[in-house]
Amino acid sequence: MSDQAYGTEPGDPTRAQLIGGSGVQLSQDEVSAFVEQAFAGADLDEKRICLVIPDRTRTCPLPLILGAVHRALAGRAKEVTVLIALGTHQAMSEQALGEHLGYPPGDPEKTYPGWEVRNHESWLPETFTSLGSIGRERMAELTGGLMTDLEVDVKINRLVADADVAIVIGPVFPHEVVGFSGGNKYFFPGVSGPELIDVSHWVGALITSAEMIGTRGVTPVRALVNEAASMIPAARLALCLVVESGASTLHAAAFGTPEDAWAACAAISAETHVTYLDRSYRRVLSVMPTKYEDIWTAAKGFYKLEPIVADGGEVIIYAPHITEVSVMHPQITDIGYHSRDYFLGQWDDFKDVPWGDLAHSTHLRGQGSWDPEHGERNRVAVTLATGIPEEVVRSVNLGYLDPATVDIAAYAADPDTFVEPHAGEVLYRLRPDVGGTEGSTEVAGSAGAGEPDGREVPLGGGDG
């Protein structure tokens, strides 16, 4: 992909206030002091402020961060609203919100007096306001020519548009749609309308998640997100974070414009959240944390590890706690999981399906091909070891494994299997001198030999 910013502001990490770095472990006192000092120097007096923060699918020590922000804004801000950037995820319960933000469930006033905490409600059209549209010519420029005849209405949660200052607070990780998450992505798609969500995700899917994930700099989707964010009438700031996956440890924090703070943290995330291996594996077992409540969100266990799976290999998503494919996107069970080329080759049949659903489908199916004569051929097999019934799993074109038969220790002892005990945030890749994942690796071991679960892995790239 091009190194250009597609006509948008790329961000300059040297302009952001920064603490920490790759390999650094910041103390709570260091983090609190940095946050309070950064906010003290910002123009926030008598302002209506909207804090846009992640939901529980992102590792982030929010009680620590928000505590410091609350102290920094006390007696200064006119009003403060905390908006959970759910995107199209389901709403967080009062119990979950309390645990996530560090207050007694149902009583944010006790910990954050004067603040209001709100879920972003993507299912309610009245919560949105239109900021205008991105025209066809500009869309073509932003997407590198992938979208040449499409105008997009840019809608965002009214709480952001009506604020004087909108401040993003959240981590940066490798991301399958945009390259690296964070920054303006918390606005779009975090609290945006469906139009830009669908288009941005489909642009990413056209490029493919394998190509996009962990790509540094401004990708076409990042350019689209930055363009939409520039239309927000509120002043925009961001406190971007680099967090140790699955822990509360902070490696770095940056404050400034969303573009500058994101650029600073994306560079550090690339050194922190991308692990390079010396060899490919025939099988990966992704053990999913309980914060992923359905396959829609747990799909991260696939695409964060797909690059290290040999051609014809398998990714097993192990999540006994998951009982649904998607809570908020039931239509995914109608179309199933397929590669990009499956949809493009039959576009007339799928063009009216929400493009965000199509994009998600490709994310969990990975690389593959399709033609009328041979049908679909996928690079790797995808198997669910979850609480979802076998008939449902197979109906969406995925393989099934009874989670009760999964012996994590046995898999870990198998030299042909890579076990990730906390899947979903760290991206795994092969070292450049080893090669990529498109036909450059060979299957380690022989099909069906020494399977920890007694199965024969569906090698050769079938339909799963």
Residue positions per predicted region:
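Extended hydrophobic packing segments that form well-structured cores
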Residues: 25-28, 32, 374-464
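Short glycine-rich or small-residue beta-strand-to-loop segments that form or flank ligand, phosphate
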Residues: 48-58, 81-87, 168-170, 284-288
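Glycine-rich phosphate/diphosphate-binding loops that line cofactor/substrate pockets in enzymes
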Residues: 34-50, 73-77, 159-162, 232-233, ...
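N-terminal amphipathic/basic leader segments beginning at the initiator methionine
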Residues: 2-32
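C-terminal catalytic subdomain
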Residues: 292-383
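Histidine-anchored nucleotide/phosphate-binding helix
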Residues: 58-80, 298-309, 316
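Conserved, well-structured core segments that form the ligand-binding/active-site neighborhood
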Residues: 115-276, 280
